[in-house]
């Protein structure tokens, strides 16, 4: 029977045994035996239960290993191949496609047995692939019907009944085949079938005409039929599984997000309740002005009402109106904080950054500008941190799944390798069994190709059967190690060979064993054959056909032509010429614009013909040179040929039809992609998109299904009311965004996926009469679509990027593009010419300056033969100098120190003098290109030195220079400054100045020669030393920082109001002069102290120098230098060189700049394609005719059809500032689309456009939306996420480069080190003593009990709920009740505070949480008192004090100890804070500089669009408010629009100060790139990195909390905090600990193994116990002893009194001593007994003599205890 448990794998039909009644009886017998074993609880007989095998799971394909399925057994019940199901009443069925299905062997529906003919028929139907395809087709057709049909009619119902019938039939077939619910593998046991069940149930309910259910709601369930596609396609199931896993992992993030959102919502509710309905009401406006819209003042050129406030910093009302509360809130009464629900929705909107700038502006106008800090917290903590944690979690979930898949693939590859090795091993064993070796050889020879045979022949390993011998074990150790790392591999290997005999020496070999051994070999043979077959590129017949017709070898003359052409076409210069043609052609394409003159059109037309001819010629010549067979095997050649043929078709079409506008003309832009061949980064981007699209195939289908479902759900639920004609007004006759049909519904869902959901939701609620269903559906689309699916997309993209980056970097080191090779040729030719010229000039110089060249040469040769003039020799001559700098090849010596010469002197003619101190040429005198740094790992990487210090390092052979250059590729993010900074630390700091000028300068110019020992120079040297000491002094640095801050602060006051304050203006001019002179003086001091050489070789000093030059130039009041005053805004940049935190971030940014610029260029090229396409599609079509009196009144196209008619009718023809009239404008338009700001106006104009200079019509060009959809997917999604990829990748590279300590530790050591690091900071604390006073003691017991804490927590939650229940429009009675409850809570928490102080006495104030509670109570009392006062009595809003009550909620945080996941997230935030603070500082600096520039350039811009009284560039505050808003790219289009209006939007009095629109575009685009794309992405990178670290830490076996709990338990056993407990108490202590440190009783023996040290009095120290318990959890490892000693030393430093307690014994030694004592006692007792017996024998016969009768009690032997204290 045991033989049947683990069936042998045969490579043929013997694997497949039909499932018969005997099979069922055998299963029942096995189940009975299993039950008997369980009853008898026979542990010896119990076996570990096998797991289901992954490759044999249901719905997977049967592995090829099992051979082909016999035709007669297809779709028939078979015995299960998986050993796991040996005692389950199941059988398996395989279809023709080898898909595995499992069924229960019990009766289906209690009627149909496994052998029933009807059930067998149903099984055959349900497993057939045609049945699955039929269901998929039905689902697709049904989806198409759902997307098209809207109204219910008889015609629509007929197909619905057909579909329902098909689904019911499918369910019936499956139920008859599987059973309904009771048994294993029955219909409802599969969760995917639950979906079918619900769909059918709802469909039947909707079919009955008399049913009372809501049919339209139930009909929306039909749409979930689309999910049936997932249940049929196995690949989709995997992706959905990954999605569900990521959702599981997101639980902690979601809980934390909801908690933070609730806090923000409560804060918002308390702060802004009833404030957003404040508006400017006109004076004397009727009886009820608060509810009359006509009484409200409106914004200029807008339908919005003016919002105002009465507090400091809020917006005042214009003359003729007053600020008062009304009944109307903004955005159709949907934006408000009047209750918790609306407040929560508003905060969710801010967190998702959807139209948040609108809410931000509304709050600041009504409440005051100081509430900007509330938004800073919500945006940075909520939006940036929590939403990016979602990204981090999803990325980790995806990567984890990816690792598992990779591990499985690796396991299979290893299995093939094992197979290759096993084949050879089995030969000897099979021969020993009596199998002919020749037959085996013939089998192998016939089965494998020569390549494989060679591979097999090269391996010599011991036989698989010789496991007993040591040699066999040794040889197999490697593979066993590999296998042990992967249990799946081990399992599969076992399955291959589990029943092979182990005993080789058994003479009577079982024939079955021999058969098994043979089958194992044949399986491996078949497997290898299949693998080879799989790896073959194409069929042999195809290859023959191709070589016959597609390889042209006609004649020798033809071959000569081919050879010449091949040489020409594959030459790098040809590739360079083609690339130049592509670039020129791209320029030609980009030059096209609206209203071109005829000459330019002709030039572009001819150019197009020429380039088409060139590309066609290139294609033809390459085909001739390479043959079609080889030409079309390369992807780029195929692409080139497609582009060339399309261009040719375009030219022919234009020539024949005289129509210059065709779709083919738009396809010319594909030529731009030809650049990717010679541009590696563009190539990488295209590869990433290609790989991602390939890998994302299944995910794209899932996303499509999700979008389809939501589109149809929206259409079904809201389509009747939420349509284009709902709420029609004169201003907005038709709605653009609605769900009237599938196309518009899809666009709404797509817009939500782009992040814009709130405006659509308002429209839906307005049309659906405020239905909450709108909120539910739209938030669901946002959460499911945006947060989960798109984040998985991003995770995949980042993963593709990092993989591609790895591949690309490896290729980049070895291969160059042909264009690079061609450029290298030019570079070499130029270098050769330059060198020849240099040599020629130097020869002439030497002849003039050297009258005795022979003697000079001889003298040089005598002293140092290699000291030739460095500039005059070629590279080769430096090879001979290697002996001077390196002891041997590749082994660098210590750096050569600079010779401390007192004399800066050179020999005649610039030759260097030789000295007894110098050995050879000094490194400082070599040309700059030879100053190179040998990498510390001795790999021959060379880099040019450009550090500040004189680091003269060893030189390597310059022959490797080209290799080094290629390694430092354009994508390299190596920060050389970091390396040099690390090296500089090793060099002792100089205490005196460097030389003033470079040596080369001193040698060639006599005026620069100085001698420190001679009189004029001694004074100079002393002055320099004094200056050096001054600039190096810490006070000097502090003073300069102070001056920088003051000078930056002074710039704030230079705003638009300065001319009206002459005193301030005068003071600022004076301070500006002082600051300039201070900076000038500092620069001169540094020149004198450091010398020009050192000063001008530092990048920071250059920055200081340029800023000082700008400051000096701005002092000269020359008209031509007026613009330099603006550049003083760069002055705060000096702070960068002074603050270390910002320096670190800047270094990280600088190191990423090459990669960022590369990606930026690639994005520009990628966008150029869409720009050119946009210009072709929309140029000249955005203009429209308007009625000049009303800017918003667009005229109908039936009245004014075109521009000429508009001009005739005296109307105005208006073209939007952002359009597609040329490529420059197109770039700006696409940036607005990519950032989703101002994109709706652009899309509306595109969709309404008809033809050039024609009046647009509503949605005349409806499918223009698709252009923007495609651009957003490829241009925005892929390219902008590439920025995140680059920066994260750069951060990872930097960490690898700098994080050295972990490299030298094993995984066990790392875990131990982390644990030690955590516990090293902890020590036991003395518990608070219980008071002696009875009353105090009672209160003490009360406040320290757990019940008290739970009650207080309950009260906090109750208080939070009551605060949530408050609303703005609540009745007075309810308000009064809430006030009383609030006072009651304040009283309760005050009493809690007082009784704690009473019970805990002074110890109360030693706990941080208690202090926090105390502060909250005091503030609550103050806020309660303040809120009683009237608003008029105080000058600040009392709402500010009501917020203080919310701080009480913070106490809940101390009770979330059980929520480990949330703690991890908060820990990640804490770890991120230092880095985030530095990034925040840098962002503030950027904002500060841009604010100053903004004040200089845009202070006179007329108000309009996004520029108003509060948000403007007139003052520093207004500028910072605007810049904070556009840090998230929000609303930057509204700030830019007024500035694009150039002169007409300037104030008439200040035309001179009005800037060009181009400056505004550069200003905003550069700020968005710097802040939004770079700094914010650095923020994301830090969070991702720290989240990974925090997750790793949380997954450590021991965390901070484990150590804290250890010490909490310790306090109970050590109330005096002596750090010692008695050995007798150790057992109870160890048992009282929680897992994983707990050592459960009985634990005495485990303490002996731990060998714990004890001190006098049998006491144990806490650290010794903790070390031992930690080692027990982590496991002992080599190398931990050193670390343990190190950590003990660290602890002893922190706790010096431990040194007084030196351990005198250990638990093990004590046990040994006790055992020794017991042995001695026993021996002594035996000795005494023997002595007594002897004495009794020899005793005299005298009767009065008495002895002890053998009773040893009087000797107290048993009580003797040996103490060795």
Curated annotation (Swiss-Prot):
Belongs to the sodium channel (TC 1.A.1.10) family. Nav1.9/SCN11A subfamily. Activity is not sensitive to inhibition by tetrodotoxin. Sodium channel mediating the voltage-dependent sodium ion permeability of excitable membranes. Assuming opened or closed conformations in response to the voltage difference across the membrane, the protein forms a sodium-selective channel through which sodium ions may pass in accordance with their electrochemical gradient. Involved in membrane depolarization during action potential in nociceptors which function as key relay stations for the electrical transmission of pain signals from the periphery to the central nervous system. Also involved in rapid BDNF-evoked neuronal depolarization. It is found in: Cell membrane. III repeats lie at residues 1022-1319. The chain crosses the membrane at residues 127-148, 158-177, 190-209, 217-236, 253-266, 372-397, 568-591, 603-626, 635-656, 663-682, 698-720, 773-798, 1030-1052, 1067-1092, 1099-1116, 1118-1139, 1159-1180, 1262-1288, 1342-1365, 1377-1400, 1407-1430, 1441-1463, 1479-1501, 1560-1584. Disulfide bonds join 280-317, 764-774. GO terms for biological process: action potential; action potential initiation; acute inflammatory response; artery development; axonogenesis; behavioral response to acetic acid induced pain; behavioral response to formalin induced pain; behavioral response to pain. It comes from Rattus norvegicus (Rat). IV repeats lie at residues 1328-1619. InterPro entries: Ion_trans_dom (IPR005821), Na_channel_asu (IPR001696), Na_chnl_inactivation_gate (IPR044564), Na_trans_assoc_dom (IPR010526), VGCC_Ca_Na (IPR043203), Volt_channel_dom_sf (IPR027359). Keywords: Cell membrane, Disulfide bond, Glycoprotein, Ion channel, Ion transport, Membrane, Repeat, Sodium, Sodium channel, Sodium transport, Transmembrane, Transmembrane helix, Transport, Voltage-gated channel. Glycans are attached at residues 214, 319, 333, 660, 723, 1187, 1202, 1207, 1210, 1547. The keyword Ribosomal protein does not apply. It catalyses: Na(+)(in) = Na(+)(out). This is Sodium channel protein type 11 subunit alpha.
């Amino acid at each position: 029977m045991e033989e049947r448990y683990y069936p042998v794998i045969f490579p043929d039909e013997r694997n497949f045994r039909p499932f018969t009644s005997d099979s069922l009886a055998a299963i029942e017998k096995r189940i009975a035996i299993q039950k008997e074993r369980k009853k008898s609880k026979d542990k010896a007989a119990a076996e570990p239960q096998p797991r289901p095998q992954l490759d044999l799971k249901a719905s997977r394909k049967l592995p090829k290993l099992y051979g082909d399925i016999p035709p007669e057994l297809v779709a028939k019940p078979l015995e299960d191949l998986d050993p796991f199901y040996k005692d389950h009443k199941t059988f398996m069925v395989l279809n023709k496609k080898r898909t595995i299905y499992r069924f229960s062997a019990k009766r289906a529906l209690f009627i149909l047995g496994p052998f029933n003919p009807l059930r067998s028929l149903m099984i055959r139907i349900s497993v057939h692939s045609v049945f699955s395809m039929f269901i998929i087709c039905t689902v697709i057709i049904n989806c198409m019907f759902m997307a098209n049909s809207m109204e219910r009619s008889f015609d629509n119902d007929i197909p619905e009944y057909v579909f329902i019938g098909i689904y019911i039939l499918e369910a019936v077939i499956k139920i008859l085949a599987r059973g309904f619910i009771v048994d294993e593998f029955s219909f409802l046991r599969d969760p995917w079938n639950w979906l079918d069940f619900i769909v059918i149930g709802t469909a039947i309910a909707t079919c009955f005409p008399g049913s009372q259910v809501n049919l339209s709601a139930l009909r929306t369930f039909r749409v979930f039929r689309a999910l049936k596609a997932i249940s049929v396609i196995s690949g989709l199931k995997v992706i959905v599984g990954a999605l569900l896993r990521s959702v599981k992992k997101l639980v902690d993030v979601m809980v934390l997000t909801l908690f933070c959102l609730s806090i923000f919502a409560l804060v918002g509710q308390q702060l802004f309740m009833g404030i957003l309905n404040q508006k400017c009401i006109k004076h004397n406006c009727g009886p009820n002005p608060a509810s009359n819209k006509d009484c409200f003042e409106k914004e200029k050129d807008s339908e919005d009402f003016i919002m105002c406030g009465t507090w400091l910093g809020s917006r005042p009302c214009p003359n003729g109106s007053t600020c008062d509360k009304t009944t109307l809130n903004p955005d159709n009464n949907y934006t408000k904080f009047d209750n918790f629900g609306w407040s929560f929705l508003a905060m969710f909107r801010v967190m998702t950054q959807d139209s948040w700038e609108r809410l931000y502006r509304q709050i600041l106008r009504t409440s005051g500008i100081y509430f900007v800090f509330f938004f800073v917290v919500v945006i940075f903590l909520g939006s940036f941190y929590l939403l990016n944690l979602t990204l981090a979690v999803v990325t980790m979930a995806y990567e984890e799944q990816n690792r598992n898949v990779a591990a499985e693939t690796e396991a299979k590859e290893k299995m093939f390798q094992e197979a290759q090795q096993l084949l050879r091993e089995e030969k000897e064993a099979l021969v020993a069994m009596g199998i002919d070796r020749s037959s085996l050889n013939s089998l192998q020879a016939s089965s494998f190709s020569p390549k494989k045979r060679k591979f097999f022949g090269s391996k010599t390993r011991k036989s698989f059967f010789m496991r007993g011998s040591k040699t066999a074990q040794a040889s197999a150790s490697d593979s066993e190690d590999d296998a042990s790392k992967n249990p799946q591999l081990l399992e599969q290997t076992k399955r291959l060979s589990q029943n092979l005999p182990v005993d080789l020496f058994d003479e009577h070999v079982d024939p079955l064993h021999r058969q098994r051994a043979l089958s194992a070999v044949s399986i491996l043979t078949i497997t290898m054959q299949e693998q080879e077959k799989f790896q073959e590129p194409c069929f042999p017949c195809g290859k023959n056909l191709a070589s016959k017709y597609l390889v042209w070898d006609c004649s020798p003359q033809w071959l000569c032509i081919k050879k010449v052409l091949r040489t020409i076409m594959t030459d790098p210069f040809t590739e360079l010429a083609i690339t130049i043609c592509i670039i020129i052609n791209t320029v030609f394409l980009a030059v096209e614009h609206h209203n071109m003159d005829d000459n330019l059109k002709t030039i572009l037309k001819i150019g197009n013909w020429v380039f088409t001819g060139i590309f066609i010629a290139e294609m033809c010549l390459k085909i001739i040179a390479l043959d079609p067979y080889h030409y079309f095997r390369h992807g780029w050649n195929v692409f080139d040929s497609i582009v060339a043929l399309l261009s040719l078709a375009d030219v022919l079409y234009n020539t024949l039809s005289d129509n210059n506008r065709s779709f083919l003309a738009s396809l010319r832009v594909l030529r731009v992609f030809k650049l990717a061949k010679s541009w590696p980064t563009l190539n990488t981007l295209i590869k990433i998109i290609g790989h991602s699209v390939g890998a994302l195939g299944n995910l794209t289908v899932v996303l499509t299904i999700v979008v389809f479902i939501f589109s149809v759900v929206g259409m079904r639920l809201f389509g009747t009311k939420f349509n284009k004609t709902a709420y029609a007004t004169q201003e907005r006759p038709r709605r653009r965004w609605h769900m009237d049909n599938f196309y518009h519904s899809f666009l709404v869902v797509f817009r939500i996926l782009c992040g814009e959901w709130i405006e659509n939701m308002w429209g839906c609620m307005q049309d659906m009469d405020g239905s909450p269903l709108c909120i539910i559906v739209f938030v669901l689309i946002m959460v499911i679509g945006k947060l989960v699916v798109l984040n998985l997309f991003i995770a995949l993209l980042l993963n593709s990027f990092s993989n591609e980056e790895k591949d690309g970097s490896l290729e980049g080191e070895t291969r160059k593009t042909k264009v690079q090779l061609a450029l290298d040729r030019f570079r070499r030719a130029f270098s050769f010419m330059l060198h020849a010229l240099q040599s020629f000039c130097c020869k002439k110089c030497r002849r003039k300056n050297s009258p005795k060249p022979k003697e000079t040469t001889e003298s040089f040769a005598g002293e140092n033969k290699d000291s030739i003039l460095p500039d005059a020799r070629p590279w080769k001559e430096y090879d001979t100098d290697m002996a001077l700098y390196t002891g041997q090849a590749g082994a660098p010596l210590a750096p050569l120190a600079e010779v401390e010469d007192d004399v800066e002197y050179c020999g005649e003619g610039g030759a260097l003098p030789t000295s007894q101190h110098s050995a050879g040429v000094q490194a400082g005198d070599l040309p700059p290109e030879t100053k190179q740094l040998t990498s510390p790992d001795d790999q021959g990487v060379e880099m040019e030195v450009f550090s500040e210090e004189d680091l003269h390092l060893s030189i390597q052979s310059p022959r490797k220079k080209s290799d080094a250059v290629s390694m430092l590729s354009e994508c390299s993010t190596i920060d050389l400054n970091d390396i040099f900074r690390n090296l500089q630390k090793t060099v002792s700091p100089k205490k005196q100045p460097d030389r003033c000028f470079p040596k080369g300068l001193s040698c060639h110019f006599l005026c620069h020669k100085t001698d420190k020992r001679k009189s004029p120079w001694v004074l100079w040297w002393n002055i320099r030393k004094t200056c050096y000491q001054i600039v190096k002094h810490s006070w000097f640095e502090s003073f300069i920082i102070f001056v920088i801050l003051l000078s930056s602060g002074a710039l704030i006051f230079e705003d638009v109001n300065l001319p009206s304050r002459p005193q301030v203006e005068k003071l600022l001019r004076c301070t500006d002069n002082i600051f300039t002179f201070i900076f000038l003086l500092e620069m001169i001091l540094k020149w004198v102290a450091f010398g020009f050489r050192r000063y001008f070789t530092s990048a920071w000093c250059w920055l200081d120098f340029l800023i000082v030059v700008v400051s000096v130039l701005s002092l000269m009041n020359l008209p031509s230098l007026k613009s330099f005053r603006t550049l003083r805004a760069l002055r705060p940049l000096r702070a960068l060189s002074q603050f270390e935190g910002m320096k670190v971030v800047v270094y990280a940014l600088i190191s990423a700049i090459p990669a960022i610029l590369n990606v930026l260029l690639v994005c520009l090229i990628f966008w150029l394609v869409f720009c050119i396409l946009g210009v072709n599609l929309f140029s000249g079509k955005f203009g429209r005719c308007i009625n000049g009196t009303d800017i918003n009144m667009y005229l109908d196209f039936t009245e004014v059809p075109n521009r000429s008619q508009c001009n005739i009718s005296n109307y105005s023809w208006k073209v939007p500032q952002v359009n597609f009239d040329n490529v420059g404008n197109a770039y700006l338009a696409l940036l607005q689309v990519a950032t989703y700001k101002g994109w709706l106006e652009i899309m509306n104009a595109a969709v309404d456009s008809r033809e050039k200079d024609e009046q647009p019509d509503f949605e005349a060009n409806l499918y223009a939306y698709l252009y923007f959809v495609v651009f957003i997917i490829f241009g925005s999604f892929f390219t902008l996420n590439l920025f995140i990829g680059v920066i994260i990748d750069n951060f990872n590279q930097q960490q690898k480069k700098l994080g050295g300590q972990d490299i030298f530790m094993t995984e066990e050591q790392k875990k131990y080190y982390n644990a030690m690091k955590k516990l090293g900071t902890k020590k036991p604390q003395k518990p608070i003593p219980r008071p002696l006073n009875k009353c105090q003691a009672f209160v003490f017991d009360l406040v320290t009990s757990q019940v008290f804490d739970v009650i207080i927590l309950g009260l906090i939650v109750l208080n939070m709920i009551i605060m949530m229940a408050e609303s703005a429009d609540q009745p007075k009675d309810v308000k009064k009740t809430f006030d009383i409850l609030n006072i009651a809570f304040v009283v309760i928490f005050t009493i809690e505070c007082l009784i704690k102080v009473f019970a805990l006495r002074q110890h109360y104030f030693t706990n941080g949480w208690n202090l926090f509670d105390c502060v909250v109570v005091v503030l609550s009392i103050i806020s309660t008192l303040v809120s009683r006062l009237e608003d008029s009595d105080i000058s600040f809003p009392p709402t500010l004090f009501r917020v203080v009550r919310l701080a009480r909620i913070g106490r809940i945080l101390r009770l979330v100890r059980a929520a480990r996941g949330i703690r991890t997230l908060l820990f990640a935030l804490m770890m991120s804070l230092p880095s985030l603070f530095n990034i925040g500082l840098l962002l503030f600096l950027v904002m500060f500089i841009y604010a100053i520039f903004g004040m200089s350039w845009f202070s006179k811009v007329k108000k309009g669009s996004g520029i108003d009284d509060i948000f403007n560039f007139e003052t520093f505050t207004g500028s910072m408010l605007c810049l904070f808003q556009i840090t998230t790219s929000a609303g930057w289009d509204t700030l830019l629009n007024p500035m694009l209006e150039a002169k007409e939007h300037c104030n008439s009095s200040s035309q001179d100060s009005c800037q060009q629109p181009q400056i505004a575009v550069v200003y905003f685009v550069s700020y968005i790139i710097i802040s939004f794309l770079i700094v914010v992405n650095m923020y994301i990178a830090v969070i991702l990195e720290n989240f990974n670290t925090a997750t790793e830490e949380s997954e450590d076996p021991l965390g901070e909390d484990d150590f804290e709990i250890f010490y909490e338990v310790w306090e109970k056993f050590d109330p005096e905090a002596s750090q010692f407990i008695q050995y007798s108490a150790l057992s109870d202590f160890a048992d009282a600990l929680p897992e994983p440190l707990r050592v459960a009783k009985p634990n005495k023996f485990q303490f002996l193994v731990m060998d714990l040290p004890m001190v006098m009095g049998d006491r144990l120290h806490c650290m010794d116990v903790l070390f031992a318990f930690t080692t027990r959890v982590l496991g002992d490892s080599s190398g931990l002893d050193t670390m343990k000693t190190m950590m003990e030393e660290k602890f002893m430093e922190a706790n010096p009194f431990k040194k007084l307690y030196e351990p005198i014994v250990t638990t093990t030694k004590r046990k040994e001593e006790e055992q020794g004592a017991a042995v001695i006692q026993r021996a002594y007792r035996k000795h005494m007994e023997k002595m007594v017996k002897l004495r009794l024998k020899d005793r005299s016969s005298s009767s009065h003599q008495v002895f002890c009768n053998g009773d040893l009690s009087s000797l107290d032997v048993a009580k003797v205890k040996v103490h060795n204290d």
